[in-house]
């Protein structure tokens, strides 16, 4: 089997795929944001264990979601702890017995944790969580597309058209962001979807916020339509052009160096490809590590899958000791970027 070699400035790093080595014990990825499972079901744990153990691979089992966003299971506030599995809304009570049950069967549990997502905590008139606290801007409902008036024959039912967002319809966009999510999932290039993301984004520009929740934009308006309506601090996007797009001092956050933008712009905290974070001195501007093979990867950006440690999490939040402990746990267990997903190991 051929193993890929990563070259960088004369150095070589051996990247071993995850499937190349069998772990000493079966692995189970314990998710917190996938499709919810009703109730506390230890019977499912027993069944999953029988499936996971012979294959020596990864499986996914999801606990019940917290009540903040009942249909998606998103966390209500950031969580960063090396010693306990903490979820807002009582998930700890459900998670600990499950982990103990797997440990009793010799199954090593890995939890997929996201700490930089933010969800709305207030319902609108339809009972959907899509209103934001006033302290981050005016709490507003995402606008709907105006109804189209059509000439119709007597007896025909009136057809309505709304913006294709989960917050507007409450049930659409299941393939992109899930049903009833608390952020917009706009698809298309009409007038209303163009105006919706910048308006919503400006009200959530304070970190940590979800700065890149809109996948599958149309390229023709993704760059100019969004970037021209937001500041550099809050720009967002997923489409990349060739070459580096950031240039800053070694201790500063990334800044755009192209005008007009050649691709979808990015937020300093999210949606940045690590290999593009090299400054003029060859180091990452404001981030920890710029070489993916050497970067610490316990934080997962769900939108892009970029492995990174956020600069403000390491210093500004005073979590250096906790992060270093998590890093040491990952190193001892052999968790590295070749796993394909960034996970936290829950210690026994």
UniProtKB/Swiss-Prot annotation:
Composition bias, Basic residues: 145-160
Entry cofactors: Ca(2+)
Organism superkingdom: Eukaryota
Region described as Disordered: 126-266
EC code(s) of this entry: 3.2.1.1
UniProt feature, compositional bias: Polar residues: 189-207
Annotated cofactor note: Binds 3 Ca(2+) ions per subunit.
Binding site for Ca(2+): 116, 188
Biased composition annotated in UniProt, kind: Low complexity: 161-188, 223-266
Family: Belongs to the glycosyl hydrolase 13 family.
Function: Important for breakdown of endosperm starch during germination.
Subunit structure of this chain's protein: Monomer.
Protein name according to UniProt: Alpha-amylase isozyme C
Species: Oryza sativa subsp. indica
């Amino acid at each position: 089997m051929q193993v890929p070699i990563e070259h960088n400035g004369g150095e070589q790093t051996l990247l071993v795929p995850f499937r190349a080595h069998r772990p000493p014990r079966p692995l189970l990825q314990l998710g917190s944001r996938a499709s919810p499972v009703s109730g506390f079901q230890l019977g499912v744990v027993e069944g999953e264990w029988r499936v996971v153990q012979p294959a020596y691979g990864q499986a996914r089992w999801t606990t019940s979601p917290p009540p903040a966003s009942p249909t998606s299971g998103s966390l209500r506030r950031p969580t960063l702890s090396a010693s306990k599995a903490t979820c807002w809304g009582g998930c700890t009570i459900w998670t600990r017995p499950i982990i103990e049950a797997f440990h009793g069967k010799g199954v090593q549990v890995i939890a997929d944790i996201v700490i930089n997502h933010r969800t709305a905590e207030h319902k609108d008139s339809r009972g959907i969580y899509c209103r934001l606290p006033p302290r981050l801007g005016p709490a507003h409902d995402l606008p709907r597309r105006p109804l189209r008036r059509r000439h119709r024959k007597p007896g025909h039912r009136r057809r309505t058209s709304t913006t294709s967002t989960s917050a507007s319809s409450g049930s659409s966009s299941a393939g992109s962001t899930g049903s009833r999510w608390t952020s917009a999932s706009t698809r298309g290039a009409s007038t209303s979807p163009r105006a919706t993301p910048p308006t919503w984004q400006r009200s959530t520009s304070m970190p940590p916020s979800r700065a890149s929740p809109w996948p599958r934009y149309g390229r023709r308006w993704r760059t100019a339509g969004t970037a021209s309506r937001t500041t550099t601090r809050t720009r967002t996007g997923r489409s990349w052009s060739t070459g580096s797009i950031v240039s800053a001092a070694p201790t500063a956050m990334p800044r755009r160096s192209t005008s007009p933008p050649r691709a979808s712009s990015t937020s300093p905290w999210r949606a940045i490809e690590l290999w593009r974070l090299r400054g003029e001195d060859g180091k990452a501007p404001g981030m920890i590590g710029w070489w993916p093979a050497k970067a610490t990867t316990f934080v997962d950006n769900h939108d892009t899958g970029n492995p990174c440690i956020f600069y403000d999490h390491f210093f500004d939040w005073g979590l250096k000791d906790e992060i270093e402990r998590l890093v040491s746990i990952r190193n001892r267990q052999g968790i590295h970027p070749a796993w394909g997903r960034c996970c936290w190991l829950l210690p026994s």
